[in-house]
């Protein structure tokens, strides 16, 4: 059986793309999109740790010349399990933000906006009446004009202008008043979504493509803005204005005009809604292709160095081009269907307007209507063209925004699996803490166990090392203690208490971690150190920098601690990054310390200097330290060594006792590392030798 692995260059090479433009999501690039629009590319630093298997650009894997389709990725399976959110539920959830309980300020703004909306529509309907009066006043024999008529005409014209300006003024005031409500709603939803994503477990994040995730958040936030404005300023006003015009036509000119108007509105709405529903699938396909293109670009750009190392620029360009072509095809269908919708809408409205104008002209000829009435009917019906055009575009964009918001609200509906128990207690951090694994079984995949019925104890206040071959479960122990995952069986105790009964925040606050690849923010050295404890004073940060022996580095840098480390810390060396990580955990001052392959990527000289720094700062009995290591020389002085093999504890003891044990796995690993020799070169054949 072949073991299928999906290669991810980001596991081996740093991501080197600097941020281009900050938005609600970091690393936001805008690239040309087909047909004159723009396609934003979300470049988000991946949430996956470097030792996690990531999904590559292509989901297919070649094994022995055959193309093998891997099982559904975590993202796909997770997607199928994600709860669906109905449009009605989305609108109901959104209503809570524009009419929040107990917030009178927001409610007052909404009521004022609705009042201004009503006033603008009433003034807007008055405009055709003032125009009719002006036309009728002018339709006289000018030789009989007295002095009073010009004044009446002047007042009518002034009223016409005042009504038009008043309607526009009320609309702008309404927008200004409601903008605060809309932006506050967007801010609240964005923040709540971000906070919810931070609460979701690590397994959920590993199963998602970050580029598509940030794109969904970006579109969803924009969708909120549009839905709020559409519902408050378009749907309600259009309905109100159509009802008012139909009532006026019925009262002024009879049921025949109102019947045509009502039939037109009904046919127009049915055609718009059905055509838009048909177009929705094209929009969904476009969004899917858009996410795919963004993910391909994201994976390619953040692994820029790997692309160059293997000369695969053309391969990735072809991948990106394929995604863009799918997006282009979807957008063409969107544009073509939009042209069909606009043509149908205009045909329906123009036919109705022509019929009503013909009827009005007959009325003028028969003497039942005046020329002013003809103008009034034309103005009233034609005035509906604006809200009707809005109805079509608003419904189209409203459906699209609801689709975009669906993805955003789906994120909020994902359940948090790692959470506090009802009676969670705080973990005491004023004393050394021990860690006990009792019959723990765990696997990232149900078909592949990483730990199998493991039991061991990490003594309090002592240095314990965990060693073993690759894949034996060493780093998994940290993830379980940190409660990134829950064990399938057994339990883990810290300080004598099951970690499931401990407050999650207090547990994680008690654990300090120095990882193999230190995650750094694209910020200054000072801010990166401060991240270990953001409430620390300047003096405490300086002491942590001194203890981690970063002072010399800062002295050699032109800007000192204000130097920006670059994306993922590329502006400083590996040893300096690890010292920065040590400064962080010194600032955190946690009673439990994990060093997860903290020196494996360093040269011998840097490794020894870093081990000396660790020894100076973490050798006291006040802290429990756990070292996960491949290089056995770095943990030879440990008080206890736990050797793992194939997910089980093979042996335990000190360095000397394990070396003294004949046939021990630890001794075999030690001998291999200490007696490593170069393989002999094969002898050349006699025929190839030269005298």
Curated annotation (Swiss-Prot):
Its main location: mitochondrion. Pfam families: ABC_membrane, ABC_tran. ATP binds at residues 444, 468-479. Residues 110-400 form the ABC transmembrane type-1 domain. It comes from the Eukaryota. Gene3D superfamilies: ABC transporter type 1, transmembrane domain, P-loop containing nucleotide triphosphate hydrolases. Residues 1-22 form a transit peptide. Disulfide bonds: none annotated. One of its GO terms (biological process) is iron-sulfur cluster export from the mitochondrion. Glutathione binds at residues 279-283, 342-345, 392. CDD domains: ABC_6TM_ATM1_ABCB7. The keyword Hydrolase does not apply. It is an enzyme of class 7 (translocase). InterPro entries: AAA+_ATPase, ABC1_TM_dom, ABC1_TM_sf, ABC_transporter-like_ATP-bd, ABC_transporter-like_CS, P-loop_NTPase, Type_1_exporter. The chain crosses the membrane at residues 110-131, 155-178, 228-251, 253-273, 340-358, 374-395. Residues 435-671 form the ABC transporter domain. Keywords: ATP-binding, Membrane, Mitochondrion, Mitochondrion inner membrane, Nucleotide-binding, Transit peptide, Translocase, Transmembrane, Transmembrane helix, Transport. Residues 23-109, 179-227, 274-339, 396-691 are mitochondrial matrix. Residues 132-154, 252, 359-373 are mitochondrial intermembrane. Performs an essential function in the generation of cytoplasmic iron-sulfur proteins by mediating the ATP-dependent export of Fe/S cluster precursors synthesized by NFS1 and other mitochondrial proteins. Hydrolyzes ATP. Binds glutathione and may function by transporting a glutathione-conjugated iron-sulfur compound. Homodimer. Belongs to the ABC transporter superfamily. ABCB family. Heavy Metal importer (TC 3.A.1.210) subfamily. This is Iron-sulfur clusters transporter ATM1, mitochondrial. The lineage of its organism: Eukaryota, Fungi, Dikarya, Ascomycota, Saccharomycotina. The gene is ATM1.
């Amino acid at each position: 059986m072949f073991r299928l692995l999906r290669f991810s260059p980001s596991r081996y090479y740093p991501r080197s793309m600097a941020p281009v433009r900050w938005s609600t999501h970091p690393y936001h690039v805008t690239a040309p999109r087909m047909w004159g629009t723009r396609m934003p590319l979300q470049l988000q630093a991946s949430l996956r740790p470097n030792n996690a298997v990531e999904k590559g650009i292509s989901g297919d894997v070649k094994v022995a010349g055959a193309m093998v389709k891997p099982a559904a990725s975590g993202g796909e399976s997770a997607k199928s399990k994600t709860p669906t959110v109905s449009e009605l539920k989305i609108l109901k959830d959104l209503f809570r933000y524009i009419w929040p309980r107990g917030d009178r300020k927001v409610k007052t703004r909404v009521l004022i906006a609705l009042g201004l909306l009503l006033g603008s529509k009433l003034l807007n309907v008055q405009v055709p009446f003032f125009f009719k009066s002006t036309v009728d006043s002018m339709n006289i024999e000018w030789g009989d004009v007295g002095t009073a008529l010009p004044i009446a005409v002047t007042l009518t014209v002034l009223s016409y202008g005042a009504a038009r300006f008043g309607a526009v003024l009320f609309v702008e005031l309404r927008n200004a008043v409601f903008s605060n409500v809309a932006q506050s709603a967007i801010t609240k939803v964005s923040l709540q979504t971000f906070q919810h994503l931070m609460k979701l477990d690590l397994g959920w994040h590993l199963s998602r493509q970050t580029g598509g995730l940030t794109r969904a958040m970006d579109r969803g936030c924009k969708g909120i803005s549009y839905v709020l404005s559409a519902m408050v300023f378009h749907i309600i006003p259009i309905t109100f204005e159509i009802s008012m015009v139909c009532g006026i036509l019925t009262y002024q000119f009879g049921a025949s005009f109102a019947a045509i108007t009502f039939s037109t509105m009904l046919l127009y709405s049915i055609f718009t809604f059905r055509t838009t529903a048909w177009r929705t699938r094209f929009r969904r396909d476009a969004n899917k292709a858009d996410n795919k293109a963004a993910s391909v670009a994201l994976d390619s750009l953040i692994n820029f160095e790997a692309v160059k190392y293997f000369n695969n620029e053309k391969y990735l360009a072809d991948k990106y081009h394929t995604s863009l072509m799918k997006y282009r095809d979807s957008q063409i269908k969107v544009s073509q269907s939009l042209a069909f919708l606009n043509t149908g809408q205009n045909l329906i409205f123009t036919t109705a307007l022509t019929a009503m104008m013909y009827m009005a002209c007959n009325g003028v000829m028969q003497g039942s209507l005046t020329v002013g009435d003809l103008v009034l009917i034309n103005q009233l019906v034609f005035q509906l063209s604006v809200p009707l055009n809005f109805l079509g575009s608003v419904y189209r964009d409203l459906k699209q925004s609801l689709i975009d918001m669906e993805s955003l609200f789906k994120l909020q509906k994902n359940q948090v699996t790692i959470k506090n128990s009802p009676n969670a207690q705080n973990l005491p951090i004023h004393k050394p803490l021990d860690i006990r694994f009792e019959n723990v079984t765990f696997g990232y995949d149900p078909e592949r166990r990483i730990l199998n019925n493991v039991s061991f104890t990490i003594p309090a206040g002592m240095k314990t090392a965990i060693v073993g071959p690759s894949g034996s479960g060493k780093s998994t122990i940290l993830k379980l203690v940190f409660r990134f995952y829950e064990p399938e069986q057994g339990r883990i105790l810290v300080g004598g208490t099951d970690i499931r009964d401990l407050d999650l925040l207090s547990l994680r606050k008690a654990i300090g971690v120095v990882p193999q690849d230190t995650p750094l923010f694209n910020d200054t050295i000072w801010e990166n150190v401060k991240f270990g404890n953001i409430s620390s004073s300047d003096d405490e940060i300086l002491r942590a920098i001194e203890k981690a022996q970063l002072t010399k580095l800062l002295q050699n840098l032109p800007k000192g601690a204000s130097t920006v480390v670059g994306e993922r810390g590329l502006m400083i060396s590996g040893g300096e990054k690890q010292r920065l990580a040590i400064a962080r955990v010194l600032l955190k001052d946690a009673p439990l310390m994990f060093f997860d392959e903290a020196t494996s990527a360093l040269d011998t000289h840097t490794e020894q200097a870093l081990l000396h720094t660790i020894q100076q700062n973490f050798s006291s009995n006040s802290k429990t330290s756990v070292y996960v290591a491949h290089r056995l020389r770095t943990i030879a002085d440990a008080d206890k060594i736990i050797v793992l093999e194939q997910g089980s504890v093979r042996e335990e003891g000190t360095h000397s006792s394990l070396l003294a044990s004949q046939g021990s796995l630890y001794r075999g690993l030690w001998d291999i590392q200490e007696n490593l020799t170069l393989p002999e070169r094969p002898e050349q054949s006699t025929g190839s030798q030269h005298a």
